[in-house]
């Protein structure tokens, strides 16, 4: 059903004039999520009570999701620690729809991660699908063509009854939306832990490519310029959606009742919207642009107006509707998907509308930029909003929430995994390898990733099973990018500062093992309730750890997202800072794959230092359901050195494959690389080393590399000259069909593959 945008109002409207003459009329501000002092502040700003529409607008824009009111005081640390040298390649940063980075030759890349956690529990398919759609529009709004997506997923225990429902819907939603858009899904993570039952994490990343001169920003300037809403019609879906769902906690009884707040996506509408936007940009028809996501038009109009040099007037009745009888507040705050808002000069309006007609995209002039400093919104000639736009979009409440290191932290850190019994014999070590590989934590993700198209558009160079996704940007020069996202809630629980740095280090290392140079960071910080001092301590520590880590590595945070209230009842999730890193390759033909066997008789070498570090490890989780102690040591200077060596080795052809060591340690890395290359190998452990520690330690800053026999001496010399530990630990044997750890055990590749690939189909197939 479509509804004429000129449908007359059918009920009395609370206008600004009426609000001024009825100061004592009760208003349901508490039901909309506003606290009493916040409501009183709105009255002070306006000099009267707000209209119903203004109240709705302030409530969504001052929500935790939109205003960052609990996190802003800590997030400032990113800007305070970013040096001019770190900013040198950044074309747009924190505060924009997405960060934009110069990658050379006139090209730029924009990338960002956002959460859609709470909607994805309430309605998994639409929650995940619209999460992809929303982050894609953020990228479109910067003037870029979206070229790839990635995802970070966290679910409850793999064998928990509700995990099947949530995982099935989320994976189908991501695949259904991304595949329909023609965007390759080039990587990510899927993690299972009981703490995410009832509160999954669905963090979607999108990457876009643009020429630097095509960069667009979100601002409304130029008196008389027109405001054009284009894309899908506006309906009731998503009323109080992500802006409210992401600002509240779940409980087991009422979560399913929130279904109407989840948006409904149409990827085919978004596909034509992408092409329409790109043609509008190419024609020079856009002054400023903003996507409509959380808080809908309330957000788009207030952000555009507050970022410009004037005011704005909007005629809300002009908005094309698909549902009859919507109130002004509903139209303003609807989170219906696949919509954009553009600022266009009067002389370009006809050309703009013509492009939209070509792509069968509905476009409507709904207002204009004014020379004042107010955002005025009318409904059939009656003023329902008259506000200073910055007070809505940027000057909401800011809280210095109490924070306190938990009383339980000392006991948690004292409970080391060192007390757990360890395997010693060859048979026990073999059984441990298979137990980890056959657990939901380390098994193959093919059951999930094969539902995504990884190679559509033809520019994917590396995807799953590689550590980082690699895309070709310029077909002539071979210039490309590498992207990775990583997180570890277990490490962050043990030490939030170090845990955030470990996530950063792993994402940085995953980009480096492709041969790329890491250049920029984005993040999505998933935590429990900000009203819990222990959670705020975790959050503050993680932010400082991430910011200090970026300084040590010399790469900037370009933007990000905060998701609070990730808890069910009073039980918070593990603190989960997701970190995305972008890298640049001069020539993607020199990228380093994960798979062994590219060269006959490759030498296997382990780069970095292995220590006895099992606290927070997958081994401790699988064998004893244990979480305690201290996370692995972080050495960011060593990570930087490791990246430099890998880049030089890739450039000079000294390494034929590389694979990051993380969960499951060396044993898991060897198995994954051998299975990817469908080739056997023989591992020879150092004589003076503890086999268990060498095989399963999760020490950071390590990489397994395959070195062509003819280059072993040169590569060793390079590592020695730079002070990077490099130990020969085996050889690739293309004639073999097994992984052998000499003197300890042997496992056929077929058994490894069956063990790894059978787990998720058994649980969720």
Swiss-Prot record:
Binding sites annotated in the UniProt record for ATP: 68, 112, 523, 560
Binding site for Mg(2+) 1: 114, 561
Pfam families found in the cross-reference section: AIRS, AIRS_C, FGAR-AT_linker
Active site: 65, 116 (proton acceptor)
Keyword Manganese: no
Pathway: Purine metabolism; IMP biosynthesis via de novo pathway; 5-amino-1-(5-phospho-D-ribosyl)imidazole from N(2)-formyl-N(1)-(5-phospho-D-ribosyl)glycinamide: step 1/2
Catalytically driven reaction(s): N(2)-formyl-N(1)-(5-phospho-beta-D-ribosyl)glycinamide + L-glutamine + ATP + H2O = 2-formamido-N(1)-(5-O-phospho-beta-D-ribosyl)acetamidine + L-glutamate + ADP + phosphate + H(+)
GO annotations of cellular component type: cytoplasm
GO biological process: 'de novo' IMP biosynthetic process
Region (Disordered): 1-32
Keywords: ATP-binding, Cytoplasm, Ligase, Magnesium, Metal-binding, Nucleotide-binding, Purine biosynthesis
EC numbers: 6.3.5.3
Compositionally biased intervals (Polar residues): 1-13
Paired cysteines (S-S): none
Protein residues bound to substrate: 115-118, 137, 263, 335-337, 563
Entry's Gene Ontology molecular function annotations: ATP binding; magnesium ion binding; phosphoribosylformylglycinamidine synthase activity
Binding site for Mg(2+) 2: 138, 291
InterPro entries named in the record: PRibForGlyAmidine_synth_PurL, PurL_linker, PurM-like_C_dom, PurM-like_C_sf, PurM-like_N, PurM-like_N_sf
Subcellular localization, as worded in the UniProt entry: Cytoplasm
Domain of life: Bacteria
Entry's family note: Belongs to the FGAMS family.
Job of this protein: Part of the phosphoribosylformylglycinamidine synthase complex involved in the purines biosynthetic pathway. Catalyzes the ATP-dependent conversion of formylglycinamide ribonucleotide (FGAR) and glutamine to yield formylglycinamidine ribonucleotide (FGAM) and glutamate. The FGAM synthase complex is composed of three subunits. PurQ produces an ammonia molecule by converting glutamine to glutamate. PurL transfers the ammonia molecule to FGAR to form FGAM in an ATP-dependent manner.
Subunit composition and interactions: Monomer. Part of the FGAM synthase complex composed of 1 PurL, 1 PurQ and 2 PurS subunits.
Name under which the protein is recorded: Phosphoribosylformylglycinamidine synthase subunit PurL
Species this chain originates from: Mycolicibacterium paratuberculosis (strain ATCC BAA-968 / K-10) (Mycobacterium paratuberculosis)
Species lineage: Bacteria, Bacillati, Actinomycetota, Actinomycetes, Mycobacteriales
């Amino acid at each position: 059903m479509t509804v004429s945008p000129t449908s007359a109002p059918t009920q009395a409207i609370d206008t600004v004039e009426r609000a001024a003459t009825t100061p004592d009329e009760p208003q349901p501000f508490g039901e909309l999520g506003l606290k009493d002092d916040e409501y009183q502040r709105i009255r002070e700003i306006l000099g009267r009570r707000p209209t119903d529409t203004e109240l709705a607008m302030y409530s969504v824009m001052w929500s935790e999701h939109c205003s960052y009111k609990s996190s802003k005081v800590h997030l400032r640390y990113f800007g305070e620690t970013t040096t001019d040298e770190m900013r040198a390649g950044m074309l747009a940063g924190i505060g924009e729809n997405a960060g934009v980075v110069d990658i050379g030759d006139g090209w730029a890349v924009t990338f960002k991660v956002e959460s859609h956690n709470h909607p994805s529990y309430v309605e998994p398919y639409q929650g995940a699908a619209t999460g992809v759609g929303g982050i894609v529009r953020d990228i479109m709004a910067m003037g870029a063509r979206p070229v790839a997506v990635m995802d970070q997923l966290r679910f409850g225990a793999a064998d928990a009854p509700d995990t099947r429902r949530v995982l099935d819907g989320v994976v189908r939603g991501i695949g259904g939306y991304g595949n329909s858009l023609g965007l390759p899904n080039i990587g990510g993570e899927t993690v299972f832990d009981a703490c995410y039952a009832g509160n999954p994490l669905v963090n979607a990343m999108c990457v876009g490519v643009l020429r630097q001169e095509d960069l667009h920003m979100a601002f409304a300037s130029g008196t008389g310029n027109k405001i054009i809403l284009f894309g899908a019609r506006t309906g009731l879906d998503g009323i109080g959606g992500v802006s409210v769902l992401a600002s509240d906690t779940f409980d087991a009884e009422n979560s399913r009742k929130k279904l109407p707040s989840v948006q409904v996506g149409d990827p085919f509408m978004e596909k034509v919207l992408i092409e329409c936007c790109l043609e509008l940009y190419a024609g020079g028809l856009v002054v400023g642009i903003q996507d409509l996501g959380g808080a809908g038009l309330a957000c788009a109009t207030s952000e555009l107006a507050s970022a410009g040099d004037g005011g704005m007037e909007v005629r809300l009745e002009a908005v094309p509707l698909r549902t009859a009888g919507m109130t002004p507040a509903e139209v303003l705050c609807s989170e219906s998907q696949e919509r954009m808002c553009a600022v266009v000069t009067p002389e370009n309006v006809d050309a703009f509308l013509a492009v939209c007609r070509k792509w069968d995209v509905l476009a409507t002039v709904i207002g204009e930029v004014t020379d004042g400093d107010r955002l005025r919104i009318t409904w059939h000639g009656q003023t329902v909003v008259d506000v200073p736009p910055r007070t809505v979009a940027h000057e909401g409440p800011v809280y210095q929430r109490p924070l306190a290191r938990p009383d339980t932290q000392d006991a948690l850190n004292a409970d080391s995994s060192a007390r757990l019994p360890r395997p010693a014999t060859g048979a026990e070590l073999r059984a441990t390898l298979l137990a980890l590989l056959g657990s939901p934590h380390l098994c193959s993700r093919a059951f999930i990733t094969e539902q995504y198209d990884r190679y559509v558009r033809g520019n994917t160079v590396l995807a799953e099973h590689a550590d980082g996704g690699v895309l070709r940007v310029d077909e002539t020069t071979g210039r490309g990018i590498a992207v990775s996202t990583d997180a570890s809630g277990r490490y962050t629980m043990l030490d939030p500062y170090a845990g955030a740095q470990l996530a950063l280090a792993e994402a940085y290392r995953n980009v480096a093992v492709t041969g790329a140079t890491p250049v920029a960071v984005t993040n999505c910080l998933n935590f429990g309730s900000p009203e819990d001092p222990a959670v705020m301590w975790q959050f503050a520590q993680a932010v400082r750890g991430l910011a200090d880590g970026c300084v040590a590595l010399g790469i900037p945070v370009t933007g990000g997202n905060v998701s609070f209230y990730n808890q069910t009842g009073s039980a918070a999730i593990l603190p989960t800072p997701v970190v995305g890193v972008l890298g640049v390759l001069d020539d993607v033909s020199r990228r380093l794959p994960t798979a062994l066997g590219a060269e006959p008789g490759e030498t296997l070498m382990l780069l970095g230092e292995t220590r006895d570090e099992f606290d927070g490890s997958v081994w401790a989780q699988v064998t004893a359901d244990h979480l305690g102690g201290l996370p692995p040591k972080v050495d960011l200077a060593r990570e930087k050195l490791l990246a430099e060596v890998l880049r030089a080795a890739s450039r000079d052809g000294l390494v034929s494959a590389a694979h990051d060591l993380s969960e499951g340690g060396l044993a898991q890395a060897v198995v994954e690389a051998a299975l990817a290359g469908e080739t056997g190998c023989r591992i020879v452990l150092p004589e003076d080393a503890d086999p268990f520690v060498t095989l399963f330690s999760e020490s950071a800053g390590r990489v397994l590399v395959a070195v062509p026999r003819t280059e072993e001496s040169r590569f060793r010399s390079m590592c020695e000259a730079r002070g990077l530990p490099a130990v020969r630990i085996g050889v690739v044997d293309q004639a073999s069909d097994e992984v052998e750890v000499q003197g300890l055990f042997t496992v056929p590749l077929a058994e490894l593959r069956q063990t790894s690939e059978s787990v998720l189909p058994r649980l969720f197939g």
